[in-house]
Amino acid sequence: MLPLTSSGITGDGRCLFRSVAYGACIRRGKQSPSDSVQKELADELRAKVADEFIKRRGDTEWFLEGNFESYVRKMRKPHAWGGEPELLMCSHVLGMPITVHMYTKGADNPRIIAEYGQEYGKDNPVRVLYDGYGHYDALQPSLERSVANRRMTRYVSFFYYFSRAAA
């Protein structure tokens, strides 16, 4: 597994949606979005996620907290925090796998704690980092290495490039 780097995401209640939108851009080979573009993409994704809940009501209503209509109405608000149900719906809206990572004590890289949208493949997922307290950041593979590992970096970069091109 490639080392991962975190891209700091603004904590404005949209962090989950910003992180997923950021990761989707990177996965598609686009440039990392600016803060203002992140906000716009996050709000668009949030609206589509709320619509996806309604579309999949029979499958989702049972695992949402409280009244379904109230929950969806709350999720449409720009500062409502998202969690596992929203990550699942993000994977459906985007048609992409999403992995949630979290650092554990003494680990160099965060470990995967949840996976969504595996029906869309397992290669090159959108990666988000959960801090354990409600905030999400975007994660992306880091191709930077020390001088001692440059040869391996070239190999990994070559492999990573072609695995992304095939996706």
For the regions a language model picked out, list residue spans one by one.
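Deubiquitinase catalytic domains
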Residues: S70-A167
